[in-house]
Structure formats: structure tokens, C-alpha cells
Amino acid sequence: MKQRFSQILSLVVRPAAFAIIMLFSPTYPLASASGSVPIVSVETIQLQSKLVNATLPYNVILPADYRTSKTTRYPVLYLLHGLGGHYSDWLTRTNVADYAAQYRMIVVMPEGNDSWYVDGAAGSNDKYESYILKELMPDVDKRYRTIQARYGRAVAGLSMGGYGAIKYGLKYPSTFAFAGSVSGAFGVTRYTEKEMGGASWEPFLKIFGPVGSETRKANDVFEITRALTPGRIASLPYFYFDCGTEDAAQHFNPNRELSGIFLEKKIPHEYRELPGNHSWAYWDQQVKEVLRIAAEKLRAPKASGKISHR
């Protein structure tokens, strides 16, 4: 029985010059200043993917003032669903639309099927990681008034989606300013038939290959983190992840392990262990925190014009 407690592990170890810049930089709150909760709008887009060879839908939560502020560009949070779920889960099983209404940012919820958000080991039509980075994100930037730069982009998710989000933050630091996870399945590349038995095993092998495969190694968040150089670490986004103390060991233990490696590597992050399990009640509660931190780390909306890419 794991002890019920709340733990926050937070570490900031940037060079002094960077710390001073952050200390004296102006803040850009994304929260609505009116005090009342505005009404957001939700759209569903059908995107034809060449990399997955399928039409993949995604939902978009637009800020309340998106239609009226014709020249404003907004930061974007990409919110990934879990295994066995779909793009609609966040909207139908949590109150994320209500929570997002407090912030002036766009929230995109893509379809990831059971892909683990990786480019699969078998088949040319399982390139979901490439789809997210090379097709989905450009499509969102084309359709909506987004801030098309690192400081205007974040990624987060639950379970399978939490794994994908943290991995993207580690692999693509120039793309995201924040990466967050709730109940992240970080140990997935170690899974055997014991964890993914029955009908799930064969599809899982097509994605990751057998234990020790190159695909598993390339998508192992522990190995990716251990291999980071000091220079690479300095470029990383801010990380947040949490896990319920009543979650299964296959989720809880890897979360604590990953935070330990982050501490060893001096990677700024926040890790929390909170009462709860692998459930929608827990995820509905914690997505509020993900939105709050994402809003803190992203740049505020800005008037349209020349967008600086950095």
C-alpha cells in the first residue's frame, strides 16, 4: 500500500543570466480579467493524413473572444488522449471546455487511436508522431490565428497521452515551451505480454516491436533523458507531471523514477504524487492544473503581424 501524500518536486537550475532574464521579464497572464467565465466555442476538423493514410478528426476549443478579436493570435495547447480513448474523450469525460474558458489560449485535442503517439515499428501508415508534428500542427497554424513559435505552443496528455507529451518535450525542445502529463504511462517501452496481454499484444508489437527493438529504444523516455547533454538540457521546455498514489505500480513507479532521473540531470520540472487512481475523476481534477501551468508558461495573445520564430 503506497502512502497517501502530496509531493511536489520542483527544480530550477538555469544559468544565472537566464534566471535574471526570467526574473525581470514582464508577465503575460492568459487568464480572462473580467472575473466571469466566458463562453468558449468548440469545432471539429477532419484532417486527411498522408502519413497515417486515414482521415483523423481533432477537436478545437477556441477562446471566447476569438471571433471578435479579428487580429489576435493565441498560444496553443495540444491535449492528447489515452489508450483505448479518442479525440472526443477530453470534451465528453471532463469539464475541460469550462476550465479552458478561464484562459485565452486554443486547446487542440487530436485523434491518436492506440498509436502511443509514435512512428510504429511495422507499416508505413503508423507514423503518428510524424503526423502530430508535420501534419496536425501545420494544419492548426493554417486554420487558426496561432502564435507560430515555441513560446506559444504546449503539449500535455493523460496516460498514453502523457507519455507522448513528455517524450515530445524531450525530443523537440525547440517546438514546445511546456510539456505536461497526468498519470503518464512512461514505462510503456518495457511492457511485455504481462502488461499488454490478450488482444492488445499483437497491435502493441506492431507499434513498438519486441523487447529490445530499435523502436523501443528510440521511444524510451528514460534513455532519452539519460542521454541528454548539458547543452540540450538548457534548451528543454518546462515539465510538469503527476500520478495518483492509488494508481497501478506500472504507472506510479515509472513516474517517480523519471522524476528521479530529472533531478539527477538537473532538469527543471515539477512532479506531484496526489491521492487518486487511473480514472476520469482524477484526470478531470488534474487537467485544471495542467491548463493553469500551461497558461503560465505560454506567451499571451498578441496582435497579428510578423511572427518571430524561435
Predicted regions mapped to residue ranges:
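N-terminal secretory signal peptides that target proteins for export/translocation
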Residues: 1-10
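Generic short N-terminal amphipathic or hydrophobic helices
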Residues: 7, 19-20, 266
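Compositionally biased, low-complexity segments
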Residues: 6, 28-30
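Non-catalytic cap/lid and distal C-terminal segments of serine-dependent acyl enzymes
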Residues: 31-310
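Bacterial N-terminal signal peptides
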Residues: 12-27
